[in-house]
Amino acid sequence: MESLTAVVLAAGQGTRMKSQWPKVLHKVCGVPMAEQVIRTVKKAGSEKCVVVTGFKEELVRERLAGENIYFVHQEEQLGTAHAVMQAVPLFKDNRDGYVLVVCGDTPLLRQETIEGLVCACRDHDGAAAVLTAIMDNPFGYGRVLRDAKGHMISIVEQKDGTPDQLAVHEINTGTYVFKTGALLDSLEKVDNKNAQGEYYLTDVFEILIKAGRKVIPVAAEDASETMGVNSRIQLAEADRILRIRKAEDLMAAGVTITDPYSTYIEQDVEVGQDTVILPGTMLQGKTKVGKNCTLGPDTQLTDVICGDGNHLNRVYAHSCELGDNNEIGPFVHLRPETCLHNDIKIGNFVEVKNSDVDDGTKLPHLIYCGDSDLGKNVNFGCGTVTVNFDGKNKHRCTIDEHAFIGCNTNLVAPVHVGARAFTAAGSTITKDVPAKALAVGRAKQLNIENWVKEDTYKD
């Protein structure tokens, strides 16, 4: 099979986005648009991907760099043909191969659609193939013109078309496949004699047709996947479509999502079978969720590794790891570098940061546990705080297995509580507690008799 090189057009600023960032780096479903396009073309068989940069190229290069990805710079944006010309040195030596040209702001394109376009060009001995779509409102798009037999004649841009031509509803999507040799020969003949004064890549098709070469129009089954993103409104629409696709893929794989329209799951998230995701849940980044979990409602996980059988209710977690069969929430904050093992209970209004919590430990309510190592079956009473910051440095607490920490205990780090030790409620612990000992760190209660001289409360 002949090689396929993808050219991703990513040079534009995208002024309608009203942003300091390149348009193609705005995210849809957690992934920059151009990266989403690159992933799709690679899955469709592209062996080499050439990204044409322009506005803030250093940011685009930094974010999109990867294996078999190459960058060329378009100093002036003089049209789509001019953009492709910048990439010619990277595919000119393989005239028998194919070149896929795709816009970096079309993140909804499916792998199957691109594969179909490539096959149409290859199987019908085409010099090129054009992905088209039927639009109810085609304003702003180039129109695909056909003859009486349905063969493609040319593509005319909105600003160059006659009223009859602009009445056509079949539009050019900006995604093309070319036989490499045919593209190279035709690019040399493209000029900028048009209303915009630009070098249109679409002129290549007219050149090929006049030379008696085949240009194959292929209509997309779903016109929405060809949508280009040019504004924040279109960005939100693209995000919505990809989010629903992701939810449908997960449901088809055995995940229950009770309301996909109120659930946000990004592209790179993985979820195991028989997990139930309740409304208001957001799964972001590289989050991985195991089997038989219940997530939500109103739970947000970002870059979290979550094992099997976990129940998370109104949990906010970031860059942490959970084992199996943990009960977390409601109203729990799990901060980075936290590792919860198995069968752990973390209840109302608890915050855990940079801590390792072993099997069976309970932090039921109103607790701050930071920079700490907790052994198995430790119990933290209500109101316990690990006092980990001295104003300059952070220090760790170590609490060994089966220790019982009484309510409203302050553990002033660095401190070590031994196995099966107790702390009395209300204590401030500043020294290590031996195993099986009871630590009392509070003032002795003093009752002052006759404190009230006369009864000020009357019936």
PLM features: residue spans?
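Short catalytic helix/loop segments, enriched in acidic residues and glycine
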Residues: 20-36
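Conserved core of the sugar-phosphate nucleotidyltransferase
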Residues: 58, 67, 109-195, 202
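Glycine-rich hexapeptide-repeat left-handed beta-helix
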Residues: 311-459
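Conserved N-terminal catalytic core of the sugar/cofactor nucleotidyltransferase
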Residues: 1-3, 31-104, 108-119, 123
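Acidic, glycine-rich loop-and-beta core segments that form the ion-binding/anion-interacting portion
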Residues: 266-338
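Conserved alpha/beta core of the MobA/IspD/sugar-nucleotide pyrophosphorylase nucleotidyltransferase superfamily
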Residues: 2, 169-272
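Catalytic cores of nucleotide-enabled group-transfer and carboxylate-activating enzymes in metabolic
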Residues: 4-5, 48, 88, 97, ...
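N-terminal nucleotide-binding beta1-loop-alpha1 segment
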Residues: 1-19
